Amino acid sequence: MALYIILLFAALCAGMALSVCAFGTGGKRKHIFRDIYFSVEDTDGIGVLYTKTGEYSAVLKIENPVQKYCADIDSYYEFTQLFTALAQTLGEGYALHKQDIFVRRRFAEETGGDREFLSEAYFRYFEGRPYTDSMCYLTVTQEAKKSRLFSYDGKKWRDFLMKIRKVHDQLRDGGVQARFLNKAEASEYVDRYFAMDFKNRIVSMTNFRADEDTVSMGGKRCKVYSLVDVDYAALPSLIRPYTNIEVNNTEMPVDLVSVIDNIPNADTVVYNQVIFLPNQKRELSLLDKKKNRHASIPNPNNQMAVEDISRVQEVIARESKQLVYTHFNMVVAVDADTDLQKCTNHLENAFGRMGIHIIKHAYNQLELFVGSFPGNCYALSEEYDRFLTLSDAAICLMYKERVQHSEETPLKIYYTDRQGVPLAIDIT
């Protein structure tokens, strides 16, 4: 009898050990940042991020092709065509994660050196003037098959290397400045996102505290605003890559989401734009099933759903459009003593005027923040954080503009830009 009791106790202990290994102890949230990356490796000068779930990612630093305040409608449509071509090049099993980062800085002349009195007085006049700087990164991620014991596949790895080089070439041919981050730069980029610090030379980490409304870190707080609520998709039926603003009684086109680069009280804003590329045949089959399910119950709401799905199927059949899953969010970082409600009101009012109602109950702040790490986009929930739409509509919600930076030239002439800070212009 004693032997049976000992065997039963040993079996229970073994079962508990297996359960802890497979499902954890319930404290995974405490170690959530440790479970993102496996390593960062250098592959022919390209820094490749490996996640612990088996995805590969390469990061390109790019410059958006549309000059801010250029008033050129065609350039916004050219951006849409370029990223549509990138999505078609990558195909099933890939994701595009574009991060536009806006940082409030204070002007400081970096060159130094001996100057004449007037030059010294000129730069001293602008010293400390606040302005918004921007940078843009594009991460290409290959999805890993979660059902396999060993996820490495040499053929898929070679396909990944080929596809990321094709993306780089397409961006260059489209007039977009792009280069791959190497191992050190990719590691630094991840660290800067983790600390939400894109302006200090030295990045320091600190403790995190996450609740249902914010993520706090040291002397700053972050709030993640998800753009689309999958339970209540309040989006306009027709969308363009630009919108019009009135300037001196004249309409001028600007980026559709240009409101995110001037959020009041915001110190840093990261606009995450993720496009997942699924199997097209499977998604069309699921759309057919969904349409039949709505058609089986005749009421006005179901009839509207059937008509919407039919229009989408017609566009796909006629114009060979691509179905994609998307996710858009904004990570807004402010000082710890700053009220975030002003940022919330600004975003709700600005997007509300465009017919877009941002989600009001994004209580999974930590999960959204972690899912927005470069290369970790597949950690976003398929059920709650991804929205099915056409690729053209998704790309319209991307940020397309760039601010002008000083040109690298030995002979510099300085002019002030629209933010009132000096820029070096090449006149050679």
What are the functions of these language-model segments?
Residues 2-401:
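Extended, folded cores of ATP/NTP-driven motor/assembly subunits in large transport
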Residues 401-428:
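Active-site-adjacent "gating/activation" loops or surface patches in catalytic cores
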